[in-house]
Amino acid sequence: MNPSQKNILSARGIGKTVKSGTSELVILREIDLNVTAGEAVAIVGASGSGKSTLLAILAGLDTPTAGKVELDGVDLFSLDEDARAALRARSVGFVFQSFQLLPSLTALENVMLPLELSGRRDAEARAGNILEKVGLKDRLSHYPKHLSGGEQQRVALARAFSTEPKLLFADEPTGSLDAESGAGVIDLVFELNRGFGTTLVLVTHDESLARRCARLVRLAAGRIVP
């Protein structure tokens, strides 16, 4: 690691166990992970390896059974849920396999929403600008049901980057798309990531996609493996 860089995300001894009938199911075991500012990291593994659970814990969306996560220098699990949500709103963007757009809002309004919640007075102009960056300048007034899957994911990307987050979590962002649409979305993820200088943590089962990241972290049976 370059000495001038700092860890924007640090996990130590992360474990996750859940009840399964009368027994316990171990999902994650003793995960240690550091991510430096500006880095692009892929977390890869087969279905059931624990990668999506790890991402949820790293983002403070789920709580670990053991261990500690620091995001931008803050101990996530020393905060209550409201404080964690406020930290995410300030510093984190998300892109999921399901687009999670609000069906009653237009593309423009979906992207404006986090900007308005953060108090940005230029929300409409900012949202329009980033939708143009993702190739949707002619779709601003369209509702999600009138957009293709690839277009909906582009709106979700624009929304995620609209607040210029320090860290973007992407969980199987092309999982609901055909190959052509998925390739276009992934190109945009990396283009926007470079343009905004955002740190990227990408969860995927796609090895070719993972290799586009600077570093690959592999999970198997809830552990990081070589």
What residue spans do the PLM features occupy?
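Basic, Gly/Ser/Thr-rich N-terminal segments that form RNA-phosphate-binding interfaces in CRISPR RAMP
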Residues: 226
